[in-house]
Structures are given as structure tokens and as C-alpha cells.
A protein has these predicted regions:
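Short acidic (Asp/Glu) patches
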Residues: 111-118, 124-126, 250-254
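Surface-exposed cleft-lining segments at the edges of enzyme active sites
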Residues: 108-109, 176-189, 305-310
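Charged phosphate-binding loop/patch that engages nucleotide di/tri-phosphates or the phosphate backbone
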Residues: 184, 191, 322, 328-342
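The conserved 3'-phosphoadenosine-5'-phosphosulfate
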Residues: 2, 58, 198-312, 316, ...
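PAPS/PAP-binding and catalytic site of the sulfotransferase fold
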Residues: 40-49, 117-126, 142-147, 192-236, ...
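PAPS-dependent sulfotransferase catalytic core
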Residues: 1-108, 123-133, 137-177
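Alpha-helical packing segments of well-folded alpha/beta enzyme cores
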Residues: 87, 91-94, 117, 193-197, ...
Length: 343
């Protein structure tokens, strides 16, 4: 039990039952990341399972708030300074609609690289099941860079230069004003795979932790999902509807993307009028059929090919991490990820 209100703003909860004060539920399981490793597709496929309830939004980030009350602090922090769910009551309310016979989960991809999330989750729900997903480091970081460019978290368009900024950003320099979690932009921190999984193994028994490999998931979506269902102890015999989600794209026009985001967030003066006009003229399905192809033609584009020389540099740099993860998990990721030919 959590005896008092901790640094993340948590109230007491009976971890053995997953029931918080007032009868609200703490999740039975957490998909803790990594980002760009299929977590969105897995989330969407689990949502379709009748015995599973997933939070909306997908990523509450509650247990990853290392600087939980930044608005009350004058400190300069590399930690999260956004406005996600501020109280434990707000957080557990996300799961209030779950039926008693459903497994309850969420999928905050920040939990895997957060330095405190594992301990906080264990304090709130010591019997929780944890799902972690790892991807070949160089391709993961490139995909992450493209994703953060598209969300305007990152402003350095060159992948090489962005990675080379790690040292300066660790000191709080050369950070985009739009970054509400600056440490997310320190790329080398994101591939400390062994340390990430060790944080969970330190507070959860091995049988409560499932480690998946992204390349396995890509090769066999259905098989991986059935493995996950068995781990969560829900019916794995039901049909699996394969979902493609959160495809990595490059940004064709930063200005058009910023305009699109301001409309969707309601910040543009004409946003409400445009939304109401669209609703009056077309169905939601028709709007989506028009919207997404239009965005792909005007705002986004297929990413350019990766810089092969820099990708090789990254693989050489991260080979010791891959070797360490292989040894820790007892699986030959060196061969699977093509590091056996890298000197």
C-alpha cells in the first residue's frame, strides 16, 4: 500500500487488488514502451478484445512525471513539464468505465525510459503485468527522430546533428522551446535497453514481465498478439484484427503541419467554424477518407532514405548495448539485428 501522498500525487491503493480509494481501479497491466515499436498497433488491437479495457488516451504518462509539479517550481528541469494528469484521482478515472470482468491497461511508452516509473508502478500495483518492446537501436532512433519532428518536439531536421546535440541538451542547452520533456530529446538515453529492463526486474518478479521484440511483431502480428493475450490471461482464441497504426512519416511542410495542428487543437480563430461546417456537410467516415490522403499529399511525405554511413556509426556505437541485452534476455539479438557482422 501507499501510505500517503507521494511525489507523483498518488493516494492510497490496495496493490494486491488493484483497487484505489473510492473503488477506482489501477491498471492490471502496463505496456511501457518503447515508442516506435508497435505500441499503438498493440493498443488498438487490445482495445478490440472484449475482455480488455484500455485507457483513453493511450498514454496518460502519470507514473513518468519525474517533475510532477513544475508550475510550482522555479527549477530548470530536463524532466516532463507538460500538463498530463495531475492527480491520482484524475488518473484512475480513466479506467472507471471498465467492467469488473475486464483486464485494465494503458500504454505509456515513456514508462520504459523514465527513471522512476517502474518504482511508482510497483508501489501502486505490485502485481501488475509489464510489457516491454525493444527494437534495433539505430532504426529505432531514426524513427523516433522523424516522429518527434512531426510532433514539433524536435526542431533539428538532421538526424546526425540531433544525435550529436545529446551532450549540449544534457546540460540544458540547445533545446527547442516546444519540448515539454527535454530529456526525451537525449537520444542516447533512449537506447539504454539493459538499464531500462533492469529497473523493472528490480521491482517485479520475472513472471510478471513480458519482453517482446519489435521485429518479431512485424513478422507475425497475430502470433505476437496471441502470446500477449496468454500473458494477460485473456482468451487468445478470438480472431485478431491486425491494425496498422502510427506509421512514421516525414514532414513535407512545417507551416502546413503547424496550421493543421492549430485547427485540430482549436487554437486557430476559425477552427470551430470549420469543424462545424465539415460536420454539417459530410459524415465522419467521409471526412476521414478525404482528410488522411490529403495530409499525406500536402503535409507529410515518405521519409528519405537513411544515411547509411551514420546508421553504421550508430550500430558500431550501440553494439555493446545489443550484446548486453542479448545476454540479459538469453536471446541472440546480435544476429537477429545484424550486429554479428559489425566490428
Amino acid at each position: 500500500m501507499i501510505p500517503d501522498r507521494g511525489p507523483a500525487g498518488m493516494d492510497s491503493t490496495d496493490g494486491s487488488s488493484g483497487e484505489a480509494a473510492g473503488g477506482a481501479r489501477v491498471p492490471d497491466f502496463f505496456i511501457v514502451g518503447n515508442a516506435k515499436c508497435g505500441t499503438t498497433a498493440i493498443y488498438e488491437m487490445l482495445r478490440r478484445h472484449p475482455q480488455v479495457f484500455m485507457s483513453v488516451p493511450k498514454e496518460p504518462w502519470f507514473f513518468a512525471r519525474e517533475n510532477p509539479r513544475p508550475q510550482n517550481s522555479t527549477e530548470t528541469s530536463l524532466e516532463f513539464t507538460g500538463s498530463k494528469h495531475e492527480s491520482f484521482e484524475d488518473y484512475v478515472s480513466l479506467f472507471a468505465a471498465a467492467r469488473a470482468d475486464q483486464r485494465v491497461g494503458e500504454a505509456s511508452s515513456s514508462y520504459l525510459w523514465s527513471r522512476t516509473a517502474a518504482q511508482r508502478i510497483a508501489a501502486a500495483r505490485p502485481d501488475a503485468r509489464i510489457v516491454a518492446i525493444f527494437r534495433e537501436p539505430a532504426s529505432f532512433l531514426r524513427s523516433l527522430h522523424l516522429q518527434m519532428l512531426s510532433t514539433h518536439t524536435e526542431t533539428e531536421k538532421s538526424f546526425r546533428k540531433a544525435v550529436e546535440l545529446d551532450g549540449a541538451r544534457r546540460e540544458g542547452r540547445q533545446l527547442p522551446r516546444s519540448a515539454d520533456w527535454p530529456r526525451a530529446l537525449i537520444y542516447s538515453d533512449r537506447v539504454e535497453y539493459v538499464e531500462q529492463i533492469q529497473r523493472y526486474r528490480a521491482v517485479f518478479p520475472a513472471d510478471q514481465l513480458l519482453v517482446l521484440i519489435y521485429e518479431d511483431f512485424r513478422a507475425d502480428n497475430e502470433g505476437t498478439m496471441r502470446q500477449l493475450m496468454r500473458f494477460l490471461e485473456v482468451d487468445d482464441r478470438l480472431p485478431v484484427e491486425v491494425v496498422r497504426a502510427n506509421r512514421t512519416l516525414g514532414v513535407r511542410s512545417v507551416r502546413l503541419d503547424a496550421f493543421r495542428r492549430s485547427l485540430r487543437a482549436g487554437r486557430h480563430p476559425g477552427a470551430r467554424a470549420l469543424r462545424e461546417l465539415g460536420k454539417g456537410l459530410t459524415t465522419r467516415k467521409a471526412r476521414e477518407a478525404l482528410y488522411y490522403p490529403l495530409m499525406r499529399r500536402t503535409v507529410y511525405r515518405t521519409p528519405p532514405p537513411a544515411d547509411a554511413e551514420f546508421m553504421l556509426e550508430l550500430r558500431r556505437r550501440f553494439k555493446p548495448e545489443v550484446v548486453g541485452l542479448s545476454e540479459y534476455l538469453g536471446r541472440d539479438l546480435v544476429r537477429l539485428w545484424g550486429y554479428d557482422s559489425i566490428e
